[in-house]
Amino acid sequence: SHRQSQHLAYSLDRGRSWTKFAGNPVLDLGGGGFRDPKVFWHAGTERWIMLVSMADEGWLRLFQSADLKSWQPLSEFRQDVPGGSVWECPDLLELGIEGESGTAWLLKWDVFRGHPGGGSGALGIVGRFYGTHFNATQPPEWLDGGMDFYAAIAFGVMPPGDPRRVWLGWMNSHHYGQHTPTHPWR
């Protein structure tokens, strides 16, 4: 695949316009299949965490930064999954545990093939995130029963104190998306 790297852009007007950071790329491993960064603030380490797909190899990498400009490697996450497929669109969410006062972390990623309904889908695994690495405490599970749930990312748009997370994902599959009617949109 072609070379992929991570870049930074910033806005000074609440998202109306964007400026590319002069020091781009902020993270470049020198190869392809390095995509779909999910960046979030981790209060426990007071660092930004970047979860990135090593898509073609089928695993994930974690990096940390104090300033979003300089990134240091933290750890890797690998897991045997059905279909042994391309991994994309990772996400890592801290969620409350129903009926308990603690939290757990959900690590989610999408695979190109292997879903029991046919085609691609989202896998999730519950565990603990320690600020540097993720340890699974349960086996991976499919997060949706259909083959049309892909590339979902959680957005941090809920009001403070609201524990819900909102996922926005594709209603499509790589296996037939190019064959669906698109006129006049494409």
Model-derived regions, located:
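Beta-rich carbohydrate-recognition and catalytic domains
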Residues: 1-37, 41-89, 94-145, 159-164, ...
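Catalytic and ligand-binding motifs that coordinate phosphates/metal ions
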Residues: 146-157
